[in-house]
Amino acid sequence: MRWSLTRADQTPAPKPGGQTYEEALRRNILFARLDDLVRWGRKNSIWPFNFGLSCCYVEMATAFTSRFDIARFGSEVIRASPRQADLMVISGTVFRKMAPVVKHLYDQLLEPKWIISMGSCANSGGMYDIYSVVQGVDKFLPVDVYVPGCPPRPEALLEGLMMLQESVGKEARPLSWVIGPQGIQKAPAPSRRDLKQAERNRATELHDPFSLD
């Protein structure tokens, strides 16, 4: 260990490597708005719930291995309880008997919470166009990111996670409490995603991704 003393009326001595103490201090202190720090921390610490429904879960579990290393994106903390998680990946076929269980688990997630629909079966029912399969998890849950494929590769899930992180990093944190003439009140902050869910469910035509419209 190396140390040195510098008088207050003297110029700080340069550290090994040519850096002064001011330069080293500038590299280790971050100045930002509180909202920016909250969004930065939130998007880089998404905790997924360890939950799977069908074969897509195999690809999801593979994304946590060292070969794909989902820990690079801050999502390596897999929680066994939905009360300790804020991300739920619907990976697999959602049967009608399983839908109430999925909804119950979603309600127990921590706020703010997000949903990734992984695979064709979760997105639209896949090839199971029958009475016993829900034709898309967005019929009863608000979905943030859709990952296509049957099944999607782990890289596709990581791409969906990066898209979710980008969206979370742009979310403005609403005011939680407002002081008014009636005292402290909680301001209503409805989710725009939830408000648009009914409109999106009624959509029958999608824009061509290669068009200029």
Curated annotation (Swiss-Prot):
E.C. designation(s): 7.1.1.-
- This protein's record includes keyword Iron: yes
Q: How does it assemble?
A: NDH-1 is composed of 14 different subunits. Subunits NuoB, C, D, E, F, and G constitute the peripheral sector of the complex.
Gene name tied to this protein: nuoB
Tell me, in one coarse class, where this protein mainly resides. Answer: membrane
What family does the Swiss-Prot or TrEMBL record give for this protein? Belongs to the complex I 20 kDa subunit family.
Topologically, how does it sit relative to the membrane?
Peripheral membrane protein
Iron-sulfur among the record's keywords? yes
Extract the ranges annotated as region (Disordered): 183-213
This chain's protein is named NADH-quinone oxidoreductase subunit B
